[in-house]
Amino acid sequence: MASDRADAPAQDRSGAISRAGMGIASRSSGGLCSRGRSSAKFLAMRNPTDATAAGDDPLRGTRVVSLAINVPGPVAAARLAALGAEVTKVEPPAGDFLAGAAPVWYEELALGQRVMTIDLKSVAGRAELDALLEQADILIVSSRPSALARLGLERATVCARHPRLCTVSIVGHPSPDSDVPGHDLTYQAEAGLVSPQALPVTLFSDVAAGIDAAAAALALLVGRSRSGVGGWREVALVDAARALAAPRDHGLTRPGGVLGGGSPGYALYPASDGVVAIAALEAHFLARLVGGLGIAHSDASLIAAKIRERRVDEWVTFGREHDIPIAAVAST
């Protein structure tokens, strides 16, 4: 979370990058900095520009300080910013790994936020952070508890110094294993989301945990509005991964499952120039598909033969015209 430099002054690199956004989720926590854990529900959000145009900023005036670098914390902060929160992103002198690894995404996630460099290993840096927290409503951290303790940011200290602060701690595993190291790959592996033949196609655990963390922050704000005190909620990346694995674990997406190849109306089919995804899961969609294709019944081989006759864009248009969920499979 911080570099080895002990004398780096705080630097404001903001210029406020304007606002970014996303969605939501959570599980309960109680009174004065009691510990909670988040589960994985999701609330889709509109484009942040749409929300701004409509004057719909429910978190206007809410101040967020995020010490979380890499992916989960920035995803959470971006979602809160999309709801109107004022976000200050605090980075160590070494910066955020994501800025070098995926600079465009880094900028998108930091959109509209004030970005500062503070060396939290220094006395001056900790004082600078303390001043920010005096005015903040939400704090997002993603270091392991042992690292937070070395910076004087363990739960007991933060709650005692800032009793109204709503703190979300993103960890790999829930307590008492929250000091166990890991990354998105290891959490997905634990949840059974990794194929032995290939790395994951995206950072499912990181992004899902960021969504959960945003929801956890909102839950804490609601709790504070009732009790007058903040709290501390723990969001575990492995929990987020396991939540994403639930459809597979319950058989929906396993081979032969309803969403795993067992339904001819819910499948991928090669067209003449690419591949289309057809999601005619419900009976009315499937009836429209069969009728529109002019085939006798919903046999996968009959559907496949018809789909091969036209281009992808023609099938997308066909789906719109017949009110059937059909999309092109985008290349990566």
Residues of each region from the PLM?
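Acidic, glycine-rich segments within the central catalytic cores of soluble metabolic enzymes
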Residues: 46, 56, 63, 68, ...
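Substrate-binding/gating loop at the entrance of the active-site cleft, primarily
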Residues: 67-82, 94-102
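A structured beta-alpha segment of the ubiquitous adenosine-cofactor-binding alpha/beta core
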Residues: 105-159
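Rossmann-fold NAD(P)-binding glycine/threonine-rich loop
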Residues: 153-162, 166-190
